[in-house]
Design a protein with these regions (language model features):
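Short secondary-structure boundary segments
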Residues: 115, 175, 251, 305-309, ...
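Alpha-helical, coiled-coil/dimerization segments enriched in small aliphatic residues
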Residues: 138-140, 261-286
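A ligand-binding cleft/hinge motif common to bilobed small-molecule-binding domains
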Residues: 177-187, 304-319
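Short helix-initiation/N-cap motifs at beta->coil->alpha
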Residues: 98-99, 149-161, 282-291
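A short, structured surface patch at a secondary-structure boundary
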Residues: 110-175, 277
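Bacterial Sec-exported substrate-binding components of ABC uptake systems
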Residues: 1-119, 219-249
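Proline-aspartate-enriched helix->loop->beta-strand connector
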Residues: 155, 159-176, 190, 290-307
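Extracytoplasmic substrate-binding proteins
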Residues: 84, 94, 101, 180-257, ...
Length: 343
């Protein structure tokens, strides 16, 4: 900033003139008095020196070139299946799933998830208000990890027409979503991305990154993925030298079903350092089992991942079964209820 001052070169005195009569003389014989001419007297009165006036003069601000800073590591998306152009982080952008290629013009503010697993992922990536609606079981604290958020959110039924009425900008579906439902959404022009929900936490990392890219939440997707990987590494380090118990995940509705290979429950058992006893016995997916089948599997631990009311009845049945009395899980009291939201 340059400063210009406005100051007079010299300070000048103020001059006041006062009339002051001189002494007069009386002359004898005069018939009157002759008054002398007044003489001007000069009086100098000091004045204060003027104060400098500061006048700011605008100058141009220096222009500094700033390189754009990436808010996230773009290379994390390079090998993610489904991203059509992994170098494009602008809009529009395209992704390809089993339902084909969809193009999203801008960060979607109205997203609809048809599965609980997907809405739980989205809740970790975007503001919940960007999700158009939830279903009743999303608000069940026994089944859902977003129950509190869902309780105060718009709730709809299972009629696909209700979803269409929401006018979502994109719909996220799982591989289990009814094909007719997906077809209806696509027929009215709503983009649908069908992404897989894997059976393991680490297996879901690519899915999380794909969804994050799709909705413009790349940094959040990386942060969530990093947290999952760090937690799984911690568990792996802790369990490195531990013995691996044979764990059976079994639940009962009208019949009992064991979770074998390829199941979510089985994946959790293995990541927690156990052996999936059902898979170890040749069971794939979820298969019906009898009390005798459970005895043959001979697990060290039994977990029952279903709503508490039904779980308590089934656990009592397992504990009281004569057929199961000698298997390690029953004999050692290693039968546990697991809230459905945890798998």
């Amino acid at each position: 900033v340059e400063v210009a001052t406005s100051v007079p070169v010299e300070a000048t005195a103020t001059v006041q003139v006062a009339a002051e009569p001189e002494a007069t003389e009386v002359v004898a014989g005069d018939s009157g008095l002759d008054a002398a001419e007044p003489v001007a007297t000069v009086a100098v009165i000091a004045t204060e020196a003027p104060v400098a006036t500061v006048v700011p003069v605008a100058t141009k601000a220096a222009v500094v070139a700033v390189e754009p800073i990436d808010l996230f590591d773009k290379s994390r998306f390079a090998d993610i299946e489904g991203i059509v152009d992994p170098t494009n982080f602008g809009w529009p952008r395209s992704v390809e799933t089993s339902e084909g290629v969809i193009t999203i013009d801008a960060p979607p503010t109205k997203i609809h998830a048809l599965s609980l697993g997907h809405i739980e992922i989205l809740a970790g990536l975007v503001d919940f208000d960007r999700l158009t609606a939830v279903y009743s079981f999303f608000a069940d604290p026994e089944q859902s990890n977003v129950a509190e958020l869902s309780a105060d959110h718009k709730m709809i039924g299972f009629d696909p027409e209700e979803v269409v009425a929401l006018e979502p900008e994109v719909i996220v579906a799982s591989r289990f979503t009814n094909a007719d439902t997906v077809a209806l959404m696509k027929d009215v022009g709503i983009p649908v991305a069908r992404t897989n929900l894997e059976n393991s936490a680490l297996g879901n990392v690519p899915n999380i990154l794909l969804i994050g890219y799709m909705v413009g939440a790349e940094a959040e997707a990386i942060a969530l993925s990093d947290e999952i990987e760090a937690r799984m590494q911690f568990i792996s380090d802790v369990l490195a030298s531990s013995e691996k118990p044979r764990v059976l995940s079994v639940s009962k509705w009208t019949s009992a079903f064991a979770a074998g290979s390829g199941s979510t429950e089985g994946g959790i058992i293995e990541q927690a350092g156990g052996i999936n006893a059902a898979a170890d016995s040749g069971i794939e997916g979820h298969q019906q089992v009898s009390i005798e089948s459970i005895a043959a599997i001979n697990p060290d631990v039994i977990i029952v991942p279903q709503p508490l009311d039904g779980a308590e009845v089934f656990i009592a049945e397992l504990k009281s079964s004569v057929v199961l009395a000698e298997i390690p899980a029953v004999k050692n009291g290693e039968i546990y209820y697991v809230a459905p939201r945890l798998h």
